[in-house]
């Protein structure tokens, strides 16, 4: 599938990966160590650099809030990595980041798991231009950004679908359903009371092809006060 044409925007940053924000680096190293997320120094450098790239692109395109209430390295980068606490990304695994926006959670996870293949999809061309620019600047060989609507991905199959969107779980499951392989899973970063969302997703699954067959909730509010009421949601396909 060929990406759609999108607006040409020049990358706002084109610097080597070095001498990046030492405070952000120390924060990320400490956070990852506290959760047993093993990353080498080069991966830490790339994650910090990605945070900088995200901020620079955000000045041109609305990728994340411009009124941040927490450091980008915590609120966006580390938050994305927390999915790996509940899903072991493996070599050769095919992962779809649905509605990636500014590359979240796909780019941080692609940095952390270089042997896993990530496809980042968004319906907004400018966002995909930004994502591909960041992927290129970071030198990632296992991530690709595609300008597409989910309905246009027919015929593709993935082991895992990721989402950080605010859409209800039933909607996300509906998007993921035709794209997930048998035994695959949908992993979402969500917040708030999800009881009704989960019930609706399970009901709809039971009335269609059985996906999701189960839903797990993993609270992350004990990791940082910022993650109050936030959870990782794992919806499985048998």
Curated annotation (Swiss-Prot):
Keyword Cell wall biogenesis/degradation: no
UniProt entry keywords in alphabetical sequence: Cytoplasm, Methyltransferase, rRNA processing, S-adenosyl-L-methionine, Transferase
Annotated GO CC locations: cytosol
Pfam families: GidB
Enzyme class at the top of the EC tree: transferase
Location in or out of the cell: Cytoplasm
InterPro entries assigned to the protein according to its UniProt record, in alphabetical order: rRNA_ssu_MeTfrase_G, SAM-dependent_MTases_sf
Entry's EC annotation: 2.1.1.-
Keyword set includes rRNA processing: yes
Binding site for S-adenosyl-L-methionine: 99, 104, 122-124, 150-151, 164
Superkingdom classification of source: Bacteria
Single annotated GO MF: rRNA (guanine-N7-)-methyltransferase activity
Function: Specifically methylates the N7 position of a guanine in 16S rRNA.
Family, similarity comment: Belongs to the methyltransferase superfamily. RNA methyltransferase RsmG family.
Protein's name in the database: Ribosomal RNA small subunit methyltransferase G
Lineage of origin: Bacteria, Pseudomonadati, Chlorobiota, Chlorobiia, Chlorobiales
Record gene name: rsmG
């Amino acid at each position: 599938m060929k990406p759609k044409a999108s607006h040409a925007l020049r990358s706002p940053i084109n610097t080597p990966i070095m001498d990046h924000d030492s405070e952000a680096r120390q924060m990320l190293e400490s956070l990852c160590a506290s959760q047993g997320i093993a990353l080498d120094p080069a991966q830490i450098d790339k994650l910090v650099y990605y945070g900088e790239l995200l901020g620079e692109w955000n000045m041109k395109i609305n990728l994340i809030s411009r009124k941040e209430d927490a450091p980008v390295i915590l609120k966006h980068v580390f938050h994305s990595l927390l999915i790996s606490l509940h899903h072991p990304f493996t070599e050769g695994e095919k992962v779809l980041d649905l509605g990636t926006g500014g590359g979240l959670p796909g780019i941080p996870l692609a940095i952390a798991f270089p042997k896993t293949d990530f496809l980042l999809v968004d319906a907004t061309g400018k966002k995909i231009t930004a994502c591909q620019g960041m992927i290129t600047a970071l030198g990632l060989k296992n991530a690709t950004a595609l300008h597409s609507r989910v309905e246009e991905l027919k015929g593709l199959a993935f082991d895992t679908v990721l989402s950080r969107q605010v859409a209800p779980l039933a909607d996300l499951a509906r998007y993921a359903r035709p794209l997930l392989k048998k035994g695959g899973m949908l992993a979402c970063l969500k917040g708030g009371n999800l009881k009704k969302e989960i019930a609706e997703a399970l009901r709809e699954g039971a009335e269609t092809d059985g996906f999701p067959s189960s839903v797990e909730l993993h609270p992350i509010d004990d990791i940082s006060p910022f993650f109050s009421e936030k959870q990782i949601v794992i919806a499985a396909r048998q």
